[in-house]
Amino acid sequence: MGMVTATAAAALLASPPQGHLGRRCHLVVPGLRLRPPASSSPPHAAPPLRLSNFVPRCYITNVEVDVSHTSEQEALDDHPPLLPACAIPVVHLRDVPDASPFPLHESASHSTDFEELPVLSEGELHTIAATPAHPAGLYALYASYLFGNLVEQLWNFAWPAALAILHPSLLPVAIVGFFTKLSVFIGAPIVGKLMDHFPRIPMYTGLNAVQVATQLISAAMVIYAMKNVTHASTSAVVLKPWFIALVAAGAIERLAGLALGVAMERDWVVLLAGTNRPVALAQANAVLNRLDLVCETVGASVFGLLLSKYHPVTCLKIACGLMICSFPVLVVLGQLINRFSCHALDSSRTPSEESICANLLDVRKIVQNGLSAIRNGWNEYKQQTVLPASVATVFLNFNVALAPGAIMTALLMHRGISPSIVGAFSGLCSIMGLVATFISSSLVERVGILKAGAAGLIVQASLLSVALVVYWTGSISQRTPLLIFLAAIALSRLGHMSYDVVGTQILQTGVPASKANLIGGMEVSISSLAELVMLGMAIIANDVSHFGFLAILSVSSVAGAAWMFCQWLGNPTDEQRELFMFDPHFQVEPI
């Protein structure tokens, strides 16, 4: 194969084709190949080459011609005969006004037509990472989350308080709580699967309607009991039709509330903040956690204030009015979220997905669909890349002793601790949780989400270990050991809430959007199972003297979560590196 310049090519075209008649000439121009004349034509009278829709002039400067050896027949067979529509004029190089070559070596100065591609600076990249994809939609999400969560937290405080006023025994409250956890354990996977195959906005509206309806039914049952039920035994109360309806409505209400929480915290916030904007996503998660803590405090305070001034039935009627008013507001806010985010929440469904939805909603197959959803959810859950981070979250739910709650309150009251100290301890834990939401976003910005998660778990495990040592070595009835014990538990909430925020973001990053609700529902289901197990352990070890055993189990679960997460962080897989390629932990410093 020989390479000649365009000048030689012009000579070849002008000279008679004698010895090189069987050669084929390739010009480096797409779609243009010169054909030799037919064998029947005179050697010096080659017909002009014709091609339809070609430009009237063709200027070729310093173009190499690839002359390859081939047969004449192959050259003729490669292309069909050219159409006699447009002749291709052969222009000699001397006719071209400017035949200077275009310099391509590095030292040559290039034309301004070839501009350098813009490269973002580190500050600009940080600004993009901290800017949400849809800021207006995110603010609308905050408003919806605040309003809906406030009504939900108010009701979560109202129904146990009303049952406690109705009957002095704790058994009715315990039964409702048990079946609530059981419904979440069984129903969360199938609800999560249904949410993954159903449009977001209609599902959001439907879940809000179900939650408000079940809250109203529960309130109606309690009001009916307060007006009609007199002094009765515990067994007589739990077998009444109104109580059975209360249990069923409470279970459905909790399941709908958790489904809404999973949708907003695992799916919607990711779409609005942006999966590739880790700082903005961390800040959004922190805001949602702050709103949750504020709603939990304000909801309990508002209903407690109402109970101190009005009759319980009047307070429940006020709560019902808030529920009814909340529904249209939540529906409008859902539409605003979608509109402000340029309809990012719209999800078109294919016919196959619609058939899946119809199959899941078939009442005749409810048991089969439930078992299938649990099996499918478990298979998807254990195959996710960020499984250790999710399992660590489940392990943290085993800590029911060294955390603010009913067991800790019972322990302190049994030891004769002043109620004011108990109240101050609960308030301090809430403050630490609120502070942790600010710390977590700062940690993500400085060290990345993976190291921030490890730091939160290590801090919590270390401080709970200190509290356990203080409990076993000193009497918490004394002032100094008691203060150290309570301070260690309160400070451990910094690590707990930090990992709660960061762990949520890790799952948001690692779980695909098409499976976010299914895997999130499965995690909630397993967490409910963990709480049921620890509740059973607490029932078995119901004496306060066995608190040390429960404390050891709690510390062991938190330490196990920290060890598992650090092992996962220290031995990353290729898939994990690819998933968190922008995390500082996996970024290589430039040499």
Swiss-Prot record:
Instruction: Cite the residue span of the transit peptide.
Output: 1-66
The family database entries (Pfam families) matched by this protein are listed as: FPN1
Q: Which GO terms describe its cellular component?
A: chloroplast envelope; membrane
Looking at the UniProt entry, the stretches that span the membrane are 159-179, 206-226, 242-262, 293-313, 318-338, 391-411, 419-439, 452-472, 482-502, 518-540, 547-569
InterPro entries per UniProt: Ferroportin-1, MFS_trans_sf
The source's domain of life comes to: Eukaryota
Name the Gene Ontology molecular function terms of this record: iron ion transmembrane transporter activity
Residues of the signal sequence? Answer: none
Q: Where would you find this protein in the cell?
A: Membrane; Plastid, Chloroplast envelope
Q: Which UniProt keywords apply?
A: Chloroplast, Ion transport, Membrane, Plastid, Transit peptide, Transmembrane, Transmembrane helix, Transport
What does the record list as GO biological process? iron ion transport
Q: How does it sit in the membrane?
A: Multi-pass membrane protein
Main localization, broad class: membrane
Tell me its family: Belongs to the ferroportin (FP) (TC 2.A.100) family. SLC40A subfamily.
**General function of this protein:** May be involved in iron transport and iron homeostasis.
Report the protein name in the record. Solute carrier family 40 member 2, chloroplastic
Species of provenance: Oryza sativa subsp. japonica
